[in-house]
Amino acid sequence: MLDRLQAVENRYEKLNELLSDPEVISDTNKLREYSKEQSDIQDTVEVYREYKDVREQLRDAKAMLEDKLDADMRDMVKEEVSELEGQEKTLSERLKILLVPKDPNDDKNVIVEVRGAAGGDEAALFAGDLYRMYSRYAEVQGWKTEIIEASYTELGGYKEIIFMINGKGAFAKLKFENGAHRVQRVPETESGGRIHTSTATVAVLPEAEEVEINIHEKDVRVDTFASSGPGGQSVNTTMSAVRLTHLPTGVVVSCQDEKSQIKNKEKAMKVLRARVYDKFRQEAQAEYDQNRKQAVGTGDRSERIRTYNFPQNRVTDHRIGLTIQKLDQILQGKLDDFINALVMEDQAQKMEAAE
């Protein structure tokens, strides 16, 4: 571990030199790249330097115990040794976590896609519950939510809703929401009072910047059409809705939320870039993980990850076996218990894999 930490510190010092180089300063892309790399390892370097300082103090204190000391001084030094050993252990544990490979997408904004799946109208209503849950969670975090595209049902649910959450660290916290969410409840339209089971799927994509994935205009087919509202009726006579097709991958994105065709195209392009980037990211991850099954999935959207049981006010995350008896609060956006547990489980697995 110490060799790895020393290599990180050496790289940090090298980056300091590079960021002072006029050639780098004049190159916007290199400056951004090196600044981000330095920022990513800064905490590790600071804790490592503190760790080295504590170890040096500990060596000096232990060396003092080899000298002839009176009883009071020996007790003082022993107390100092005990305190320094505690600090050394704490810093060592922090360094183990800091050395866990960081997902380069963690700090990014996210595009979230929620779709009603099995269960018809009830699944669409549940998709609306999930959208509001994530919106409220984002609000608590101080993040901004913006709807990109929504396909409504007559009962007020969503066949599909795509929205962006802007905020640092959004992907780090929300990436574990990928998958199938199951709901068990008595539908409002059910006169017999029977519990129905429905599902909605959630996809969380990191926003892709133009420098990360270059989509050429010639590779995108643009189709325009009239926007439609609930039930499919036309809501305007202008061709403001936009459909983009990325020809090399077959990825298709539509947007009709704005009255302006230009704004719809801009929003659709954000989603298209994120989906194409995510497709390549998933393929690379699948190849890397083909012989290793991760317990905390962040990619398989067919995986049933969570059940929301309304009669028992209970939510269960099946990946980590965590059940919480406060469904009402969770749907109000109080997701920290689940998100923190999933992040900790992911870190523990990565630490184990790194050993």
UniProtKB/Swiss-Prot annotation:
Primary location recorded for the protein, binned into one broad class: cytoplasm
Cross-referenced Gene3D superfamilies: 3.30.160.20, 3.30.70.1660, 6.10.140.1950
Post-translational events: Methylated by PrmC. Methylation increases the termination efficiency of RF1.
Keyword Ribonucleoprotein attributed: no
Transmembrane portions of the chain: none
Keyword Lipid metabolism in record: no
GO function term, MF aspect, one: translation release factor activity, codon specific
Name recorded for this polypeptide: Peptide chain release factor 1
Lineage, opening ranks: Bacteria, Bacillati, Bacillota, Bacilli, Bacillales
Gene name of this polypeptide: prfA
